[in-house]
Amino acid sequence: VLGYRPARSRIFASPQGESMRATPDFDFQLGESAEMIRDSVARFADEQIAPLAEKIDREDYFPRAELWEQMGELGLHGITVSEEDGGLGLGYLEHVIAVEEVSRASASLGLSYGAHSNLCVNQIRRWGNAAQKAKYLAPLVSGEHVGSLAMSEVSAGSDVVSMKLKAEAASRDGVDGYILNGTKFWITNAPYADTLVVYAKTDGSAGSRGITAFLIEKDDAGFSIGQKIEKVGMRGSPTAELVFDDCFVPEDRVMGPLNGGVGVLMSGLDYERVVLSGIQLGIMQACLDTVIPYLRERKQFGKPIGSFQLMQAKVADMYVALQTARAYTYAVAKACDADQTTRFDAAGVILYSSESAFRVAAESVQALGGAGYTLDWPVERYMRDAKLLDIGAGTNEIRRMLIGRELIGAAG
């Protein structure tokens, strides 16, 4: 059939640990590099991540020892980093696909991976100077270190430019720099992070023009991890508060222009939204990989429930939602690689993929009936995990406002 290849193996571990049948993959004609990334990451996800997925969720466990450096050995942490700096020198399309395949096995690991490789590593790649890249990229790309990014605060979520974390110019022991005071909240990877990109107010009177990006190291005096945050979903992706109490940061760790941090932040947010959309693609694929075998095997009224048209309609809607989200996400990722993306499409892909994923996950719970509402099957985890990206990286309400404003402005 036009558009299909021989199916690659998509292994789903049932509660009994048996392998389910594969589902066919549509060929989006993404190119050799993208397909090589998909195949290698899918194999790694099936063999190494999937067996740990339940433990990651149930125990809120971050598998740094088991998986993080292995992911570095595969080159996953430096997909968009140049080969000269130790990365693969590939693009956002390949990055989306890697996030998708990791998330198919464990969305929480996919979230931590995306926060590390895109929010931290890719921002240093884009905005760091030569000395900063030389110091920080190698251990982050190898997986020796974990990266994080911090912009949100308790009182600065959607209105992130109202942040209160202050950075005041100062000198210490003859070194010029800044003293940071305040907190950040809801910070992914914070408890394990070695290197953090942190946004702070360097000019409190300048509004959005008074924000600067800093590179923070975990052992900086005056910097500490506050309370760990327990989440409904994405358990195993560690989240915590950051506390800065007279934390001195030398001037050479300012990343990007002084007082120009909002440009660093907003441009990074566009790429973040595209790359993290891969999480939702992975969740939707995992839903189909779980539901289709179940509908074939579960019998009621003497026949497989997959023979009932209402169940067939559910699967059809799930499949179309996934493939539509994939087409949009891959197209915008390719536009990012061509430096042709728009802010409203970056918001559009995560808006559509997040709402689609939560709907698909909820329908997966429904398709499994009583079994879906137990911890014996992973669909309840898919639903809990899918909800995050209706909120994270900017809420869907903010995304709709941004899309409408940008389109009306463009039309005018």
Enumerate the predicted regions with their spans.
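A short core secondary-structure module
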Residues: 176-225
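Flexible, small-/acidic-enriched active-site or ligand-binding loops
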Residues: 162-164, 219-250
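Short Gly/Pro-enriched turn/cap motifs at secondary-structure boundaries
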Residues: 140, 155-158, 186-189, 203-205, ...
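Long, acidic (Asp/Glu-rich), low-complexity accessory segments flanking structured domains
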Residues: 245-264
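A structural signal for short hydrophobic beta-strand segments in well-ordered beta-sheet cores
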Residues: 165-169
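Alpha-helical interface subdomain recognition
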Residues: 13-115, 127-132, 139-144, 159, ...
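A short, Trp-centered hydrophobic/proline-enriched beta-strand micro-motif
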Residues: 143-151
